[in-house]
Each structure stands twice: as C-alpha cells, then as structure tokens.
Amino acid sequence: MATLRLTKLLPWAALLVMGALWGLSFSLARIVTAAGGTPFGVTFWQSVVCGVILLGFTLARRRPLTLDRRHLQIYVIVALLGASIPNSLFYFAAPYVQAGVLSITVTLIPIITYAVATAIGSERFSAVRVTGVVCGAVAIIMLVVPESSLPSRAAMPWVLLACLSAVCYALENIYLSRPSLQDIGPVRTACGMNLFAAAIMLPIALGSGQMFMPSLSFGTLEWTIIGLGLINAVAYTTFIIVIRLAGPLFASQTGYVVTLAGVIWGIYLFGETHSAWVWGSVVVMMLGLALVTPRRTDADADADDNAAEAS
C-alpha cells in the first residue's frame, strides 16, 4: 500500500521539482545579465554546460548521438528554434522585464503551438481550444496595453520580445511532433540541440563582441551560467521521467507550475510586486492553458507507454 501511494505521489513530486527549477531560470536570467553576461555569450555558455551534461548522460546509457546528414539537419533546426534564438531573446529582455512577467510569457507556448498546428492542418479545430488561444492573446494584452500593468511602459517592447521566444518554442514543438523524428528520442534531441546551439552561437558571440571568458575565480556570473545549464539538463531529464511515469498529458501541466514558480521566485529574490493587471493576466493565461490542453482519450494510454521509449 505504501509503495502504491509513493508511486502515485512520485509524478507529482517530480512535476513540482521540475516546475520550480524551470521557474527559477527566469530569475537567474535577470541575475546573469545584471552580473555582466551578454545575451549571445550567456546563450553560448549555457548551451555548452547543458549539452556536455546531456552528452555524458547519453554516453553513460550507451545511446550516443547519430551524426548522419538527416540527424545533423534536425539538430540544427531545433538548435535554432529551441535554444539559440529564444534564449538570446530572453536574455535581451531579462534586464527590462520582471522575472514573474517573463514566466507568464512561457505559458503561451502550448497555446501558440495549438494555434499554429490548427492553421497548418495538423490539429483539428476545437471551439474550446480556440477559446484557450483567445485567452492567451487577452492575457498578453492585459500585460502590455494598460498604463498601470507594468512598472515601466519601457518594458512593453521587451515583453513582446519575450513572447517571440514562445513562438520559437511553439514552432520547435510542431517540428518535433513529426513522426519521422520520433526515432531520435527527447534526451538525445536535447543534447544535440544544445551542442549545435553552442556551435551556432560561438561565431555570433565572437562577431558581435559579446563573447566573454568565464573567470576561474567563479563569481556570480559563472555560477549562474552553470546553474542555468544544470537546470535545463536536470529539468528536461525530469520531464522525460514524468512522461514515463504518468504520460505526456500529465507532463503538460508543467506550464502551470513553471508560471507560478517563476512569479514566486521573482517575489522572493527581487521583491517584485505586480499590478492587478498582471495577476489577472496570470489567471487568464492559466485558463487558456487549461482550455487548450487536449483531453485524455483511450488512445493516449498506448501513446503514454511509448512516448519516451526512444530517449
């Protein structure tokens, strides 16, 4: 009985840990830029740390990366959509946007994913789920339109820039949902994504003058970069564990925890305060996420069993 109870609680515990870690990353983004990290430079070093950790994980499992032409193309595309572009945008926005507000924009990912998937015909139209998309749009309007929503009106374009990151992640989700990509596995995909993101960002950081070398004395900048890389690696691996334990639909609830954790971390670390408009945006965004998340069907049971087999 105790073992059964523990088995039921484990996915919830993993969900909370994963959400808390990813939620912390928004505050760390503000810390790393305040410590002197440049957007392109931080994106490069974060990708290096995360990629090396996941590479060690894949090698330990004797499931190394496949480096034929097809897989290289996949790694480059997901590196651009899932790391290089969205991470850089987030780090450009981080100095100007509260950590809690940054975390709200991430909730747009599943909402935008459904909107784009419906537009290209890979998802069926659903009035309920479209209502969720509308809620997402309303939530962002509540953030950027009212005069009193943000501490400074100067933050508005940076909030919209952060929303572009969500668009990138949504496009990545749609690309990775293609059946022809399912043989790679999520952990190896994340490993290849980060290693290739580092390769992409290296010349960009050097050419833009944003490359920096971490100090061997390890100050705030260096520890925060390591923390960001560790969070991405650990949280992503935990995400795979949750899928295996409880299925992808259960794991999709991560968005709720990440947003709330991001807001709470911002309050705890920076003493952030939010207007009624921001809190209202959180509620509307959560409603949108709930509406756009697909309902479980009988067919999902088999999908849950196979969701992470190739990892």
Regions found by a protein language model. Give the residues of each.
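Glycine-/small-residue-enriched transmembrane alpha-helix faces in small-molecule transporters
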Residues: 1-41, 45, 151-178, 199, ...
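Hydrophobic transmembrane alpha-helices of multi-pass small-molecule transport proteins
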Residues: 54, 125-147, 201, 256, ...
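Transmembrane alpha-helices of multi-pass small-molecule transport proteins
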Residues: 10, 34-85, 112-113, 167-172, ...
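Juxtamembrane helix-entry segments on the extracytoplasmic side of multipass membrane proteins
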Residues: 7-11, 36-44, 67-73, 145-168, ...
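Transmembrane alpha-helical segments that form core, pore/gating elements
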Residues: 54, 113-115, 119, 150-211, ...
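Specific transmembrane alpha-helical segments of multi-pass solute transporters/efflux pumps
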Residues: 21, 25-26, 55-106, 142, ...
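C-terminal transmembrane-helix exit sites in multi-pass transporters
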Residues: 53, 58-62, 90, 109-134, ...
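Helix-helix packing/entry segments at the starts of transmembrane helices
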Residues: 42-45, 83, 87, 101-108, ...
